[in-house]
Swiss-Prot record:
CDD domains: PRTases_typeI. Regulates transcriptional attenuation of the pyrimidine nucleotide (pyr) operon by binding in a uridine-dependent manner to specific sites on pyr mRNA. This disrupts an antiterminator hairpin in the RNA and favors formation of a downstream transcription terminator, leading to a reduced expression of downstream genes. Also displays a weak uracil phosphoribosyltransferase activity which is not physiologically significant. A motif (PRPP-binding) lies at residues 99-111. This is Bifunctional protein PyrR. Keywords: Glycosyltransferase, RNA-binding, Transcription, Transcription regulation, Transcription termination, Transferase. It catalyses: UMP + diphosphate = 5-phospho-alpha-D-ribose 1-diphosphate + uracil. The keyword Transcription applies. GO terms for biological process: DNA-templated transcription termination. It comes from the Bacteria.
C-alpha cells in the first residue's frame, strides 16, 4: 500500500523553486522551450511554463514527447506485443533553443536516454537541460538532472508515484513497497 510522502502544496513549492532556478541559471527566459515526457512530465512542463509566465511575463512554449519507440526495454517481457504509441507534440522549432526536458521521476535514467534520442530526431537544440520533480537515485546510465524538486532516496524494492490533478484527480507523491 502506498503512503503519501509529499503533499500537493509541497509539490507546488518544489515546482516554483525549479522555475526560479531555471530563470536564474538561464539569465532570463529567452530561447527556452519546455518539453514534457508523457504522461505526467507534460503536465509538470505546462505548470512550469505557467509559473514562468506569471513571474517573467513571457509565454514559454511547451511540447510533449512520447518515447515509447525509443525505449530500450520496449520488447520486454513479451517481444511479440507492439507498444502503444501516443503522439509527440512539439509545435515549436527546437533548433538552437534551450530545451528543458521535464519528467516526474528520475530513476535509472533510461527514460531520459530515450527522450534524448527522440528529441534529437526533432532537431538540434543549442542546449538540453533536465528538470525532474523527484530524483530517487539508482542510476544505470550517466544522467544527472539540472533541476530537482525533491531528492527522495529509495530502495529498489520501492516505487515512487507522482499524482497530478490534471491526470489523476489529486496531487501528491507517494511511496509504495513492491512485493
Amino acid at each position: 500500500m502506498a503512503h503519501e510522502i509529499v503533499d500537493g502544496s509541497s509539490m507546488q513549492r518544489a515546482l516554483t523553486r525549479i522555475t526560479y532556478e531555471i530563470i536564474e541559471q538561464n539569465k532570463g527566459v529567452d530561447n527556452l522551450v519546455f518539453v514534457g515526457i508523457k504522461t505526467r512530465g507534460v503536465y509538470l512542463a505546462q505548470r512550469l511554463a505557467k509559473r514562468m509566465e506569471q513571474l517573467e511575463g513571457v509565454k514559454v512554449p511547451v511540447g510533449s514527447l512520447d518515447i515509447t519507440l525509443y525505449r530500450d526495454d520496449r520488447h520486454q517481457p513479451d517481444h511479440h506485443v507492439e507498444p502503444t504509441v501516443n503522439a509527440t507534440d512539439v509545435d515549436v522549432d527546437i533548433n538552437d533553443k534551450h530545451v528543458i526536458l521535464v519528467d516526474d521521476v528520475l530513476y535509472t535514467g533510461r527514460t531520459v536516454r530515450a527522450a534524448l534520442d527522440a528529441l534529437m530526431d526533432l532537431g538540434r537544440p543549442k542546449r538540453i537541460s533536465l528538470a525532474v520533480l523527484v530524483d530517487r537515485g539508482h542510476r544505470e546510465l550517466p544522467i544527472r538532472p539540472d533541476f530537482v524538486g525533491k531528492n527522495i532516496p529509495t530502495s529498489n524494492s520501492e516505487t515512487v508515484h507522482v499524482a497530478v490533478e490534471e491526470y489523476d484527480g489529486h496531487e501528491d507523491i507517494s511511496l509504495e513497497n513492491r512485493k
